[in-house]
A protein has these predicted regions:
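Hydrophobic, proline/glycine-rich low-complexity stretches
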Residues: 1-74, 218-223, 227, 234-235, ...
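Short, surface-exposed, charge-dense and proline/glycine-enriched linear segments
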Residues: 6-11, 79-91, 134-139
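Internal, well-folded beta-alpha domain core
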Residues: 30-31, 89-271
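Short, surface-exposed linear patches
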Residues: 53-57, 75-76, 85, 114-116, ...
Length: 271
């Protein structure tokens, strides 16, 4: 995919999920930091059957933090305690020969040990960490709600910092601290922002096979942001080196997402 970085973009229509829906979740207070990397470097992490997705001649690596809220099984209610936690992940961008776009997770840090153990058992690279959300400025009365009111709340409030602090367990374990200040109320709708966030599934290696786990959600309400603080060791720990500040910095109050039935990817289809 190529395009004019400054041109407006159209958010793709969210896909219909193959039944059954196996999880309903809310991803809130999301911070997206992205750096360019070479397609060749990204290719070394791709599972069989998919290749790196490219925008403006580059692959991209992302550091993304958010609050998981009310995650539940099927269409049921959120699971108490286990369904709400902080997550910070490092991800790449993938594409199948048929055009299906997704993400490939290099790591996903979470602060709920049972969640980490359960997801690692099926091949998703979760890591148990201590994660704290960076709070708003002292005295801020911001209260971000679920649904459409999230966008309205963000659009009428003063700028506030939001970010995450990650400490993996162990004296020499990787750490990350990042905070951004959203530029409100102007929405970010450029092609790169859409390319990095309009992702409706993940590619991964599960039990010896490549599979795609689909999800669907409405368009992220996106805002550009300025880096307030950044000290990251998670990307390096995943095996990728980046230099300088991130080229894309975004904030979103959040979306509701649902996950559907996985499907296998034909490993011989790449070329």
């Amino acid at each position: 995919m190529t395009g004019n970085l400054g041109a407006p973009a159209v958010w793709p229509r969210p896909p219909e999920l193959p039944a059954p829906v196996f999880s309903d979740q809310r991803w809130l207070d999301a911070v997206f930091l992205h750096w360019r990397i070479t397609e060749e470097e990204a290719a070394t992490f791709m599972p069989d059957g998919v290749r790196p997705d490219v925008f403006d001649g580059s692959s991209w690596v992302g550091l993304i933090g958010f609050r998981m809220e009310q995650a539940g099984l099927g269409r049921g209610p959120g699971i108490p305690y286990l369904g709400s936690f902080n997550e910070v992940n490092v991800r790449l961008y993938s594409r199948e020969p048929n055009g299906t776009r997704g993400v490939v997770f290099l790591s996903l840090d979470a602060n709920r040990l049972p969640v980490v153990l359960a997801t690692r058992a099926v091949g998703i690279p979760y890591v148990w960490s201590r994660i704290r959300q960076r709070p708003p400025f002292p005295g801020s009365s911001v209260r971000r709600q679920h649904g459409h009111s999230e966008v309205e709340a963000a659009a009428i409030t003063d700028e506030f910092p939001v970010g995450y602090s990650v400490r993996r367990f162990g004296s020499a374990a990787a750490r990350s601290d990042f905070t951004v200040v959203p530029r409100l109320p102007a929405a970010a709708g450029d092609p790169l922002s859409v390319f990095l966030t309009a992702r409706f599934g993940m590619h991964g290696h599960f039990f010896g096979r490549t599979a795609f786990i689909p999800n669907t959600h409405q368009a992220w309400p996106l805002f550009g942001a300025n880096v307030h603080q950044l000290s990251d060791g998670l990307i390096k720990a995943a095996g990728i080196s980046v230099g300088g500040p991130p080229e894309s910095v975004l904030y979103s109050p959040g979306v509701r997402t649902r996950f559907g039935r996985p499907r296998l990817v034909c490993a011989s289809a790449t070329g």
